[in-house]
Amino acid sequence: MWTYPLTWGGIVGGDNAISPYMSYYSGTQYQLKFTNPIIMNGIVYFSLPANNAITGNGVTAVDLRTGKTLWTNPDIASVNFGQLYDFESPNQHGTTGIYLWVTGFAGVSIRGTGIVNPGADAVSALSGSYPVGTDLGAVPAVTSTTAVVSTTGWMAIDPQTGKLLFNETNVPFGTRAYGPQGEWLISNIGRANSTAPFTYLWQWNNTKLPGNDVPGGITQWIPGNTNWNMSTAYDWNVTLSQALYQTKTPIGAFGGFGLAAAYDPATGLYTNNPTIVRIFPGDKIYGQTSGMQQTPGTGAGYTGTPDPFTLWAINLNASRGQIGQVMWVKTYPAPANNITVCIGTGDANVATLYYKETMQWVGIDMLTGDKIWGPTATETPAWNFYTGTTGLTNPIGVGNGHLYVAGYGGVLRAYNLKTGHIDFTYGNDPNDPKNSTITPETAYGDYPTQVAAIADGKVYLVEEEHSLNAPAYHGAMTRCVNATDGTLLWQIYGISSWQEQAVADGYYVWFNCNDGRIYCIGPGPSATTATASPSVITKGDSVLITGTVTDQSPNTDLKGTACISDADQSLWMDYMVEKSVAAPMNAKGVEVTLDAVDPNGNFIHIDTVTSDMSGMFKKMFTPEVSGEYTIIATFAGSGSYGASYAETAIGVLEAPPATPPPQYPIPIDYTLPIVGTGIVLLIAIAIVGILLLRKRP
């Protein structure tokens, strides 16, 4: 659809590089150029990176379908997530809370002068995104005088303009989840004191603005421009049906993702708090109490597993039971031989565990905690050992009832979440270039493959590794495969990081490390033309129908060029946009249906033809009756283009009646009477001769 030059890309040039044909730094993995893009309402929002930095030049908004820049705010370093909140009340219905959120600051206040002042203790946390003196429009003075007791706050940004709307302060720490109406929910478990067990669970809601009710109790969603003290914005705080306890283990590490809270050198034991792993709003919370790494891993670097290790689940579904009821707490024996068990991904029905050293998976029933399948067979090739062992590779994902696993082995596997069975693989058929990642370009013998996104029945794959080499691997692709059978849908030359992707509304947006551009891939608009020559004919004669089907994408490299078949699309894009291959001389166009409506209103199917590499199609047509015809050329659309059609008309005249030959007088022919008279005379003479002969004696 379009490309967006984000940073330096391609080959540097000159002769001062250590390696010939040196490329620019791609940013992997610590200075990503296109980190955390957000797509919302047909707009993609992303940070503009400074030189060798993730952010620094503001945030911009680009139309998802056209690539047009809508606004840029240099005063925002980055945005963390979006929100589409559906507020419902007797007076108000529909999605009205439409925001981008900037998080992670302390005690932000909005002055009556319209100047945002983060305060001296918060400037570094904001990375200067709202420096003192930045005028973001007039807003009222702070109305809340409650002291800030939390170390985090949120700023709401208008997605249409990039301007600050309001703040939410006193936002608690916890695990964030997106609610059923678009609320941002934060949950955590707590205890009475530092030595007590964990006995209560709460849920905070970012839409519970205090006092946001009009007189009479009929509520409306009107946040206004102010600071909102969210210290009381809780949906509920409930007592757990049974307490959750810390565990002490000899195996562990400090850090996030539920790792150990403390270490006692005297005993050699790590203290692990109960930690939420995943929230399924309105359904359940899944957690652990063993400080285990999560996959993608935390980079903790330890091996082995606490024996036993503990998992649990808490009910959030009021129709199933009390909110806060502990559904199950289970301990599991660690596998033999010092295997490291990691917390895998999953859905609301099945959780997964990953055995790192043996590259195996286990399925856990989320309703009971029972193991329902696994361990699976060891994955191959052996390079897959590095699957998700750091937080900077993300070779896995869940969707469509599958656990999708890839990695340094270059093979995508689709594990059935119900059974653990591998329903299909992709990338391991050396005899099929459309189903192989094998290459001599890497030390692994294949392209390390990561799951970048799962959406709309598709799995998007990128080929990269931690700390990508420069120049990048020759031939590495970004690919899209069918999520149910692994069929390759398209591939394009380009290497990327799984962290530099976004997909929504049928469009896939990603950063190409090869040329430093953002690419938007999806179905583009098309245009069809049709003519017939000659336009007026005599019945019995033929006309030649011609026309074109062309790409109308906003990309200047594509607009007005031929629409090409899905089968040839990948190579065509490499040629037209990336200029990385020669013109594919055998590329096919698209199918065009030719029909006509005759003078009597009858529909006539003429034929289905295929356009060529220039977009042209043609077909002879011989009308059968006289009168006016409408001829319709229809391109029904494809995986690459939207539909279009065109009409033209011809006239058919009745043939004039045949002209009779001229009539001339017929001359009298005397030949036959003369001949006849001669014959009579001859006969008479003969008779006389016969009679004379008879009279002779």
Q: How does the language model describe each region?
A:
Residues 1-538, 543-572, 577-578, 585-596, ...:
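Secretory-pathway ectodomains
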Residues 540, 615, 625-629:
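Short tyrosine-centred short linear motifs in exposed loops/low-complexity segments
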Residues 602-603, 639-645:
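Short, exposed coil/turn segments at beta-strand boundaries within extracellular/luminal domains
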Residues 611, 617-625, 635:
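Residue-level recognition of secondary-structure-to-loop junctions
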Residues 644-669:
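C-terminal low-complexity, Ser/Thr- and acidic/Pro-rich disordered "stalk" regions positioned immediately N-terminal
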Residues 665-679:
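Juxtamembrane/start-of-transmembrane alpha-helix segments at the extracytoplasmic/lumenal side
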Residues 684-697:
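C-terminal membrane-anchoring or membrane-association module
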